[in-house]
UniProtKB/Swiss-Prot annotation:
GO biological process assignments: lipid A biosynthetic process
Annotated PANTHER family: UDP-3-O-ACYL-N-ACETYLGLUCOSAMINE DEACETYLASE 1, MITOCHONDRIAL-RELATED
Species, as recorded: Bdellovibrio bacteriovorus (strain ATCC 15356 / DSM 50701 / NCIMB 9529 / HD100)
Gene: lpxC
Superkingdom of origin organism: Bacteria
Catalytically driven reaction(s): a UDP-3-O-[(3R)-3-hydroxyacyl]-N-acetyl-alpha-D-glucosamine + H2O = a UDP-3-O-[(3R)-3-hydroxyacyl]-alpha-D-glucosamine + acetate
Name by which UniProt lists this protein: UDP-3-O-acyl-N-acetylglucosamine deacetylase
Length: 302
């Protein structure tokens, strides 16, 4: 039986907000079994909390923001992508402001902080959203679908007219090792013309070459260049993994994305919820292969 997990003890991440440029502090704290993942705004009266769920997603333009009637938390995807890869089910995430520290624009700072304090099993079984039939979502030239699979697999394709990016695809089985090796260090990216426009509107005050890949035409402005030639699609994989946390339950399925951003990911999660005959909520034993055959009738690839 696979058990739910949380962290062993609290850990703190400090940095600046990408839009405000202000210092901000994030504190990860253990949470009891069957809690889920909650953000807590300690800077507000009563320290209100907000669950990470697609139902609370308020904005999906260039990032994912969750919110309630009186407050919000912006750019959650880099942080929570690490939770998915580490199979952390229950966590309190305290914030002293509306933004999460941007770090270097990747998920590395969050992954390192969580691994440093350790991850512990809890006394309740881990419940999965087990895809049994294909689920599709399309919007113009953007496409997303999920099909049965014996783990979590992401195939992500992006296609930009800028030749430095162009068309890139990553196909990855997601686990702690593959995430740390192939995805966690991939940075967010943007174009110089867009950065200048954002700053003229009082946004992206914390943005710099230290936390974002910046392209000026076909040229990468960052002196150190790229960490991988396909760092762009690796980061989109990171984003998608973070957005899947809003499903509120770990997914077992193969997610295939084409030109799909945060908006499409939010709609895909909602489409899964709206397709109750295409998934089951299950607790998995040690023999994944037998479980897959029992619930889906699909054969696990050898």
């Amino acid at each position: 039986m696979f058990l739910q997990k949380t962290i062993r003890k609290k850990t703190v991440v400090q940095g600046i907000g990408i839009h405000s440029g202000d210092p901000c502090t994030l504190t990860f704290r253990p949470a009891p079994a069957d809690t889920g993942v909650y953000f807590i705004r300690t800077d507000l009266p009563g320290s209100p909390s907000l669950k990470v769920t697609a139902r609370n997603v308020q904005a999906t333009s260039h990032q994912t923001t969750i919110g309630g009637p009186a407050f919000s938390v912006a750019t959650i995807e880099h942080c929570v992508s690490a939770l998915s890869a580490l199979r952390i089910d229950n966590l309190f995430i305290e914030l002293d402001g509306p933004e999460i520290p941007i770090g270097d624009g990747s998920a590395r700072v969050f992954l390192e902080a969580l691994l440093a304090v350790g991850i512990v099993e809890q006394d309740q079984p881990r419940k999965y959203c087990y895809i049994t039939e294909p689920i599709y979502f399309s919007e113009g030239e953007k496409h997303a679908y999920v099909v049965p699979y014996h783990g979590l697999r992401l195939t992500v394709t992006i296609d930009f007219p800028n030749p430095t990016i162009g068309k890139q695809t990553i196909d990855l089985d997601i686990n702690e090792q593959s995430f740390g090796r192939d995805v966690a260090n991939a940075r967010t990216f943007g174009f110089m013309k867009d950065v200048e426009a954002l700053k003229s509107r009082g946004l992206a005050k914390g943005g710099s070459l230290d936390n974002c890949i910046v392209l000026d035409g076909e040229n990468v402005v960052n002196p150190e260049g790229l960490r991988w030639a396909d760092e762009f699609v690796r980061h989109k994989c990171l984003d998608a993994l973070g957005d899947l946390v809003t499903l509120e339950m770990p997914l077992m399925g193969h997610v295939v994305l084409y030109k799909a951003g945060h908006d499409v990911m939010n709609k895909l999660v909602r489409k899964i919820w709206d397709s109750p005959t295409s998934y089951r909520h299950v607790e998995l034993g040690a023999d994944i292969s037998d479980e897959v055959r029992r619930y889906t009738g699909w054969t696990v690839p050898v």
